[in-house]
Design a protein with these regions (language model features):
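A glycosyltransferase accessory/donor-loop signature
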Residues: 1-11, 170, 174-326
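Hydrophobic targeting segments
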Residues: 6-9, 26, 37-40
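Short loop->beta transition adjacent to catalytic acidic/histidine clusters or analogous donor-positioning motifs
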Residues: 30-39, 64
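GT-A fold catalytic core of metal-dependent nucleotide-sugar glycosyltransferases
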Residues: 66, 70-72, 88-140, 153-155, ...
């Protein structure tokens, strides 16, 4: 296995500062690699943002490449309604066209993350027949059935993905992704994440949860997650406790804790993110308004003020009404 780490991000200009914080943390935490090449799928960044990211890479003597994605995304016949943020996320479907042909694997990382540990162990992971490796997500079985997958199969969070590029090229997964998007008339359940899960099917490796510690895992126990999301299986409580104590990648997903760059966030790793952001050229960026939708803010209030059993009852039944009755 090569000692070169290939990492990929995608972003528009709105998320460029948070990409910068994540990238800085990646480089700080992975000095053991002899070479790190970072590919930025550019969905509309300014020249100033690109220069800022180049400055961060240069601080660590690492390589960075920018790939304009507008023409690629234009191939997608998307009908997303109000979900405009999902458009840039679809860029990860084009990884085979972004990375060089001699690159057999890549670690895709969402911008809203902080890397706190070495990635050397998972980078050397043998794929076998698998197309992706990732962490099981906290979503209910509706999303599996909605994209035609067997109930009980671990649904992978696409925010952190180790991608078998060699197999993606050989089996032309891009064409399969586009086929799924057409099948759902441009509105796949869970967007790009649903598309990737639908195509990869059972050919996935489930990584330890410490490699993608999403916000829900700070709010709920393993038992509660299985109950409120109607999951047949999930990580154990010991798995969650160990990951929270020593995370490799913290993923600041939308949730009850808010996001660290927004006002009112109570995320336990909030200051770690803000410290990383402060060390980038965007260090003076003020906190942004809380962007969570009204319903999620209401659930946050109930979470903080209601008995836990009542909250779980409300949350579970909301999931049932939104998904399982469809």
């Amino acid at each position: 296995m090569s000692d070169t780490l290939y990492a990929a991000y995608n972003s528009d200009d709105n998320y460029a500062p948070y990409l910068g914080a994540s990238m800085l943390s990646l480089l700080q935490s992975n000095t053991s690699f002899s070479r790190i090449c970072i590919y930025i799928m550019d969905c509309g960044m300014t020249e100033e943002s690109r220069c800022n990211l180049q400055h961060i890479a240069a601080q660590f003597g690492r390589e960075i490449f920018f790939v304009p994605m507008q023409q690629h995304i234009a191939q997608l016949d998307l009908h997303l309604g109000a979900h405009k943020m999902a458009v840039a996320a679809y860029a990860r479907l084009f990884l085979t066209q972004v990375l060089p042909e001699d690159c057999s694997r890549v670690l895709y990382i969402d911008c809203d993350t902080i890397v706190k540990g070495s990635l050397a162990e998972i980078w050397k992971l043998p794929f076998g027949n698998a197309l992706i490796a990732g962490v099981q997500d906290t979503v209910d079985n509706y999303f599996l059935s909605a994209i035609g997958l067997e109930k009980g199969l671990p649904y992978i969070n696409a925010g952190i993905l180790l991608v078998n590029l060699e197999a993606w090229r050989k089996e032309n997964l891009l064409a399969q992704f586009l086929g799924v998007i057409r099948r759902f008339d441009g509105n796949v359940p869970a967007h790009d994440q649903g598309t990737i899960n639908a195509v990869c099917g059972a050919r996935r490796i489930v990584l330890p949860v410490r490699y993608n510690l999403t916000s829900n895992l700070y709010s709920f126990s393993a038992k509660t997650i299985r109950r409120i999301y109607f999951l047949d299986s999930y990580y154990s409580q010991n798995d969650l406790d160990a990951a929270i104590a020593d995370p490799a990648i913290v993923h600041f997903t939308t949730g009850l804790l808010g996001r660290p760059w927004e006002e009112g966030s109570t995320h336990p790793e909030r200051q770690v993110f803000l410290d990383a952001l402060a060390a980038t050229p965007w260090g003076a960026l003020p906190l942004q308004p809380d962007s969570r939708y009204f319903g999620l803010k209401c659930f946050t209030f109930f979470y903080e003020h209601c008995p836990r059993g009542l909250f779980e009852f409300l949350y579970r039944n909301l999931c049932w009404m939104l998904h399982l009755r469809k």
